[in-house]
Amino acid sequence: MLSKWIILFLIWSLPFGQDVIGEGLYEDELIGFLQENYKTSTTLGYTMARDTMYLRIDRIDGQVKGIYTNYSLTLPDGVDPSTHLYQNGSSNGINCEHVWPQSLYEGGEPIKSDMHALRPCKNNVNSARNNKPFDESTDTQTITWYWQNSQTSNIPSSNIDEYSENHESYFEPREDRKGDIARTMFYFYTMYSDIADEYFFEGQKEILKTWHAQDPIDEDEIARTWQIADYQENKPNPFILDATLVERAYFYDGILIGDLNEDGLLNILDLVMLVNIILYDEDGSPAADVNGDGAYNVLDVVMLANIILSQN
């Protein structure tokens, strides 16, 4: 009974409108559409882009926080942002993380300065991540755990989801930033696939898709991409505006997960159909298993609701 009321509450909470980018397009055709409409040819140049990110995009209440650790430094007015945050290169400083490593693409500007792919990062964590791919790290195989200003080689006894993990071969961001990282990676490869390392992307694609679903788009992420767009030809990261793009561009096999009425859209009608499948034990299509766990339950409803909400 509780599950039923949770499901009904989710439906009542949903708005009916939604924005669909490249409606009816899939795979290469959709990727081409995204490149044509969302790829910027104008950036600020790396020095100005980095300072703008620190001062105008990611300074909140006077603080700049690292993407992987939530570690923060105060950034006052009237100082050089990059110099002040860098702290002479100490481990407690903050520098600029290229979420897609610079060593894994060919070319300079405007790619290097595209703020959709840049994030503030604690100096020593940036060095630890280096150019490693993203993936899940088994706790017992994690070399170092990072959170705020602390690092440890021992499995944390509390707040474990707040830590990012450095493995010998890959890097795992903290739980509530995995979706942000995934959508950045899909953006970068989509816009710059002609020069980005294809094998680097293909090796991470599946886990990035999972993270995109598990850590859905939120209002802060939407606000940030539009702030960046103000400096880059009014072009946001489309993967933050339409949660269906990841699957439609890179995983489409004729079935759009969550599209139960097969109209090419994810909306309230699909949610109603999913609820009926769960409540009345009806046979469902593969599209109903939104979280990919092999079952139809309230978790699928929550995930589909998050996807629909993120498109509004």
Residue spans of the language-model regions?
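Domain-level detector of nuclease and nuclease-like folds
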Residues: 86-95, 99-254
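Sec-dependent N-terminal signal peptides
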Residues: 4-14
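Low-complexity, Pro/Thr/Ser/Gly/Ala-rich linker/spacer regions in secreted
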Residues: 15-20, 247-261, 311-312
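Extracytoplasmic/secreted envelope proteins and their assembly/folding machinery
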Residues: 27, 31, 35, 119, ...
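N-terminal module-boundary/linker segments of secreted carbohydrate-active enzymes
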Residues: 18-74, 249
